[in-house]
Amino acid sequence: MSVGNRLRRWLTAGGAAAGLAIGGFAAAPATAAPCETGDFAQWLQTFKAEAMSLGVSPATAANLDGLTYDKKVIGLDRNQKHFKVPFEQFLKQRLNPGRVAKGAQMMKKHAALLKRIEERFGVPGEVLVAIWGLETDYGAVSGKMPVLRSLATLAYDCRRTDLFQTQLIDALRVIDRGDLTAAEMRGAWAGELGQTQFMASSYYQYAIDFDGDGHADLLNSVPDVLASTANYLKGYGWQRGAGWEEGEPNYQALKGWNKSDNYTRTIGVFAKKLAGGA
């Protein structure tokens, strides 16, 4: 999913409030600076103290030390292009023959894993592989920007303070839990992580260890990636055995993944192709 799509999903779903619920805490965020003014380093130390007051360990909070404001992130945030395209055009852009062919290969390669995941969560493999392909081309393009720096920059910014301060706290909690190190936390510019692009609060709530190594690793572990994606959909109301096309029960669960009807419908079309439909 593009960064713009992911942000639209959070914002149209009441992202800040949802993030606070997901993060499991309710506290006034550190004061945001007016746009383009203030002292980022000073704000960061205030935020660090607040993070520790919310239970983040001092060792993990120390990863905030020395972070610098990233003007590139703000530029990308300010210059997002929001426009609607007809569904058929969107579908053609996202669902090229190569992506579909590779998806079919992934269905075969991970058939046993996908069966185990469906047995546990009720989400068919074709839906998970469709999301995986659309998000990052099966892990090929998941982003290389340092997530803590990106989230700190956006949390300091005046426009979405509550949303991104929540995300930053939960990114630190993911580190505290032992799933990833700060150095491993690289993703898209708005903080999306892993092969299906979880925001930090979603990572904290829905990411699970499915390969048995003791860590929920959505960057490198395909079992963790696909099972966590299924767990996310289940958390948004996925019903075992129900349909996912528009008007069917699981369409709304897919919209919990992305509020865009074009994107949700594209997941459905892709999944149907992977299942052997037209």
What are these regions (language model features)?
Residues 20-29:
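C-terminal segment of classical bacterial N-terminal signal peptides
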Residues 56-278:
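Catalytic glycan-binding domains that act on GlcNAc-containing polysaccharides
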Residues 15, 48, 111:
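Short amphipathic alpha-helical/adjacent loop interface patches that line ligand
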Residues 1-2, 6, 28-34:
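Basic/polar N-terminal segments that are highly enriched at the extreme N-terminus
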